[in-house]
């Protein structure tokens, strides 16, 4: 006698399905593959840790999206708190965001293109790109996203992803990830 039991766990709820129920369900559902794999993308907003399996490009995408749409008035975890500290590095390297806002006319129709052109020029001016240049660039993008959010240009956060891809390669993203991991461990230990 074969007994098939499927167990589905979601949060604090679980569902147990027996073989007979499976057979009944198959009659009414459209054709499906026998085995499906669900990919669950983590929500980094309230993350306190950074694991080796986490992708920095995905984390930055979520960071810019949240910051561009909601700002920092929402509750966020230690990971986003550490990334927010990159804003200070950006101001040290690039000057205040108000100066750049005027210089690049960020609020104009051409503001997004002006910003991308500025990023390209910055990359060309750097002889040897360091991880700290990249950290400053992440901070700069976050500050620019704030400007656009305040002007209700909510969809422009995606331009910051493009800027990051132009400026930072995968090797540097891995270095930034290591720095963030070390900072998070240090904060946890103190």
Swiss-Prot record:
InterPro entries to which the protein is assigned, alphabetical: Poxvirus_Bcl-2-like, Poxvirus_sf
Protein name per UniProt: Protein A52
Gene3D superfamilies attached to this UniProt entry: dsDNA poxvirus (1.10.437.20)
Record-linked Pfam families: Poxv_Bcl-2-like
BP GO annotations: symbiont-mediated suppression of host innate immune response; symbiont-mediated suppression of host NF-kappaB cascade; symbiont-mediated suppression of host TRAF-mediated signal transduction
Signal peptide: none
Complex and partners: Interacts with host TRAF6 and IRAK2.
Recorded family membership: Belongs to the orthopoxvirus A52R protein family.
Keywords on record: Host-virus interaction, Inhibition of host innate immune response by virus, Inhibition of host NF-kappa-B by virus, Inhibition of host RLR pathway by virus, Inhibition of host TRAFs by virus, Viral immunoevasion
Function: Bcl-2-like protein which targets host toll-like receptor signaling complexes to suppress innate immune response. Interacts with host TRAF6 to activate p38 and subsequently induce the expression of several cytokines such as IL-10. Also associates with host IRAK2 to inhibit NF-kappa-B signaling.
